[in-house]
Swiss-Prot record:
Binding site for [4Fe-4S] cluster 1: C64, C67, C70, C114
Protein name per its UniProtKB record: NAD(P)H-quinone oxidoreductase subunit I, chloroplastic
Annotated catalysed reactions: a plastoquinone + NADH + (n+1) H(+)(in) = a plastoquinol + NAD(+) + n H(+)(out); a plastoquinone + NADPH + (n+1) H(+)(in) = a plastoquinol + NADP(+) + n H(+)(out)
Organism: Drimys granadensis
Keyword Cell inner membrane attributed: no
PROSITE patterns, A to Z: 4FE4S_FER_1 (PS00198), 4FE4S_FER_2 (PS51379)
GO molecular function list: 4 iron, 4 sulfur cluster binding; iron ion binding; NADH dehydrogenase (ubiquinone) activity; quinone binding
Subunit structure: NDH is composed of at least 16 different subunits, 5 of which are encoded in the nucleus.
Amino acid sequence: MFPMMTGFMNYGQQTVRAARYIGQSFMITLSHANRLPVTIQYPYEKSITSERFRGRIHFEFDKCIACEVCVRVCPIDLPVVDWRLETDIRKKRLLNYSIDFGICIFCGNCVEYCPTNCLSMTEEYELSIYDRHELNYNQIALGRLPMSVIGDYTIRTIMNSTQIKITTDKPLDSITITND
C-alpha cells in the first residue's frame, strides 16, 4: 500500500507541475496579445530606412574628375567610367558613367572612397523591374534624386514660399523675389 501512496503523490505533483507550465505559457500568450503588430503592409506603408541605409547610388556628373577610384575599390569592378584625356589642359574629361544595379552588392565602398564626394547613397530601395537591362543606370538616371527627397515637406514649403516675378518697369535682367 505504501508504494501505491507514493505513486499517487508523484502523480499529483506532476499534475500540479504540468498545470503550472500550462498557466505560465498561457500568461505569456496573453502578454503578447495586447502588443501592436510589427508587420508592415508593404505596398501601402513604406518602411522607414535607417540613417546610414545603403540604397541606390546618386551620382553628380559635374563633381566627378574621372579618377576611377570607385572602380578600383569596388569588389566586382562594377562602375563603368568612360573618359578622354584633354591634351590641351592635360586633364581627364568624363564622357560616360554607369552602374548596373542588377550586379551591384550595395557595399558602399565607391561612396566612401570617392575623393570629390560625387557619389552618395540614397534611401531608395524600390528597384524592382521586369527587364534586368533597365537596372543599368547611366549618369542621367544616377543623377535623379529619389521621390522621397523631391516630395519632402521642407523643400515644398521653400518652393512655395518664394515666387519669381519679372516686373516690366525694370530691365529684363532684374528679377524680384517676393514672399506671399
